[in-house]
């Protein structure tokens, strides 16, 4: 059987690997970290963990599980995917892998702005997921950091729970509708004692905020998709219910396809993509 190469070893990629390798496929998973999940601390909305589970522990357990079943984990990044004589050529800085099928599961890359203090307050006011953490900021004042459609989308999620939300574009011109409340000043730093308390701007002024939701840029999978000629909608890869793209042998799962950016959904996507990629390989 031809090899299956999975790009991304977050929940979607590892879930796909578990199903494919158990079905007899040789599987290589390429990734540098656990994706967007690495920005989380305690996961409190995942089935079976009544007291929550640390994101780091969940990522590491999934990787060990896949390795124990025989999947190869390659810590690297994908430079490109090309069409080979039979199948695909997946290029990394160190090697080129031949694959009969490929699953793109790198998720949506989140660009972290270079703002002093942003790392200090991750988990203490700074969040990367509105739908995950909006609940904890009810009755408080929060900012969304970003200037595009992703920032506007996170704003709408937050406004369903929080009344006081402002988008801070960090000096960039917004591409979302001007009717959304926003501030275009360049951000100098985040400040606070034990948690985020204020945003200080480059002009010396400041504004109090209890939380900041980072929503800069968009997808990492998008560039791979466009180079391959995959159909996209916005910054998402278009798939059918089998997580198959418009190119036979290429599948996509997780945050890079439409739907909620949640662990449970990513695991489900991976299951579907892994089983369907296995069927595809067996048909070759």
Residue ranges and their predicted role:
Residues 1-5, 73-139, 213-215, 237-241, ...:
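FAD-binding core/adjacent interface of flavoenzyme oxidoreductases
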Residues 13, 110, 151, 207, ...:
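Glycine-rich nucleotide phosphate-binding loop and flanking beta-alpha elements
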Residues 4-60, 65, 140-146, 150-174:
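Beta1-alpha1 glycine-rich phosphate/pyrophosphate-binding loop at the start
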Residues 114, 120-136, 217-260, 265, ...:
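FAD-site-proximal beta/loop scaffold in flavoenzymes
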Residues 37-38, 112-113, 153, 209, ...:
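Glycine/Thr-rich phosphate-binding loops of Rossmann-like dinucleotide-binding domains
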Residues 63-85, 89-91, 97, 160-236, ...:
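A Rossmann-like FAD-binding core segment of flavoenzymes
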